[in-house]
C-alpha cells in the first residue's frame, strides 16, 4: 500500500514517539535501584533532620577555626550525632556522584545504570573504609587522644558539609533548570575547595600536637596519596 508523504511523516513521527517512550520506561526500570536508595536517603534525612539542625552551628565553626574541631570532640553527644549523620550522608553523596557523573572513568561508560550505581557506592564505601582503617593504624606518636580524635574526625565534619553543598547545588539546578555539565563543574569546584579547606584545618590540628614533618608524612600517607589514586582512576582510566 502506497502512503502519501503526510501519512508517512505522521507514521514515522508516531513510531519515534513510541520508541522514545519505551526507551524512557526502560531507562527508569533499569535505574530502579537508584530510586530505592533515594527513598532510603529521604527516610534517613527525615529521621535525622533535628540532629542535623543541631550540629550545623558546630560544623560551620569547624570551617572557621581549627580549635572548634577539638571543641566538638569534647562534647560526646555532638560528636556522636555528627558521626551518625556522616554515616547516613554516604548514600546521598554516592547518589549525587552517580547522577552527575562526578566519578565516571572511561571503563564504566559501557556498563548499565544499576551496575554503575553499585560500582560508585562500592568504590567510595571501600575508600572511606580503608581510609578510616589506615588512620587508626598509623596513629602519630606523642599525640593526645583528644587531639587525635580531632585529627581523625574532622573528616566527618567536612564530609557532611560537602554533602550538604552538593545537595543544595542539585536542588538549585532543578529549580533553575541548569545544564548538567555546568552543574557537574560547579560540584567539582565545590568539592575541590572543600577538600583544600579540610586539609588546611587538619594540618593546623596536626601542627598543634606534633612536628610539621610528622604531620606532613601523615597527610601524604593517609590523605594525599589515597585521594590522588581515586582522582587519577577517574581521570586516566
Predicted regions and their residues:
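Interfacial/capping segments of alpha-helical transmembrane domains
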Residues: 1-9, 51-63
Amino acid at each position: 500500500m502506497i502512503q502519501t508523504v503526510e501519512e508517512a511523516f505522521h507514521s514515522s513521527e508516531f513510531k519515534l514517539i513510541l520508541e522514545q517512550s519505551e526507551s524512557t520506561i526502560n531507562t527508569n526500570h533499569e535505574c530502579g535501584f537508584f530510586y530505592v536508595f533515594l527513598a532510603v536517603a529521604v527516610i534517613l534525612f527525615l529521621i535525622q533532620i533535628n540532629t542535623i539542625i543541631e550540629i550545623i552551628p558546630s560544623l560551620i565553626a569547624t570551617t572557621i577555626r581549627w580549635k572548634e574541631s577539638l571543641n566538638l570532640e569534647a562534647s560526646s553527644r555532638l560528636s556522636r550525632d555528627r558521626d551518625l549523620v556522616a554515616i547516613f550522608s554516604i548514600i546521598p553523596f554516592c547518589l549525587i556522584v552517580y547522577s552527575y557523573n562526578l566519578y565516571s572513568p572511561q571503563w564504566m561508560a559501557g556498563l548499565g545504570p544499576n551496575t554503575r550505581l553499585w560500582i560508585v557506592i562500592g568504590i567510595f564505601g571501600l575508600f572511606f573504609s580503608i581510609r578510616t582503617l589506615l588512620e587508626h593504624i598509623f596513629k602519630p606518636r606523642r599525640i593526645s587522644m583528644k587531639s587525635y580524635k580531632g585529627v581523625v574526625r574532622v573528616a566527618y565534619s567536612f564530609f557532611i558539609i560537602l554533602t550538604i553543598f552538593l545537595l543544595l547545588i542539585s536542588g538549585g539546578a532543578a529549580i533553575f533548570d541548569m545544564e548538567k555539565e555546568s552543574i557537574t563543574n560547579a560540584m567539582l569546584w565545590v568539592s575541590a575547595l572543600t577538600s583544600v579547606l579540610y586539609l588546611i584545618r587538619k594540618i593546623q590540628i596536626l601542627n598543634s600536637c606534633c612536628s610539621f614533618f610528622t604531620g606532613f608524612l601523615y597527610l601524604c600517607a593517609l590523605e594525599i596519596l589515597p585521594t590522588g589514586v581515586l582522582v587519577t582512576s577517574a581521570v586516566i582510566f
